From Swiss-Prot:
Description of how the protein assembles with itself and partners: Self-assembles to form functional amyloid fibrils called rodlets. Self-assembly into fibrillar rodlets occurs spontaneously at hydrophobic:hydrophilic interfaces and the rodlets further associate laterally to form amphipathic monolayers.
Disulfide bonds listed in the record: C32-C90, C39-C84, C40-C71, C91-C105
Species of provenance: Agaricus bisporus
InterPro entries tied to this protein: Hydrophobin (IPR001338), Hydrophobin_CS (IPR019778)
Record protein name field: Class I hydrophobin A
Signal peptide positions on this chain: 1-19
């Protein structure tokens, strides 16, 4: 019985070793995984009132996330003279409605 378990373990070990993903490169602090980096004139955390109002607009809001208002995409390289006087942000949900430009935003450290 022990020999069967030992043989099974020896057969399974190479399969586990080859299936393990290699660690990737660490990401730069200025990288935005979900798209472009935006410059938002105003950022705020939603409260229950704005979250309820957003439901009426059809825009789901996470109460723990930042909202971005009056946002424009910026280039990480600063090509074309793009700069951001406010804090650059990376947003997971770019829903451009009449009131809210970006959802679930987090600040990004970018030297523009």
């Amino acid at each position: 019985m022990i020999s069967r378990v030992l043989v099974a373990a020896l057969v399974a070990l190479p399969a586990l070793v080859t299936a393990t993903p290699a660690p990737g490169k660490p990401k730069a602090s200025s990288q935005c995984d979900v798209g472009e980096i935006h410059c938002c004139d105003t950022q705020q955390t939603p409260d229950h009132t704005s979250a309820a109002a957003s439901g009426l607009l059809g825009v789901p809001i996470n109460l723990g996330a930042f909202l971005g208002f009056d946002c424009t995409p910026i280039s990480v390289l600063g090509v074309g003279g793009n700069n951001c006087a406010a804090q650059p942000v990376c947003c997971t949900g770019n829903q451009f409605t009449a009131l809210i430009n970006a959802l679930d935003c987090s600040p990004v450290n970018v030297n523009l």
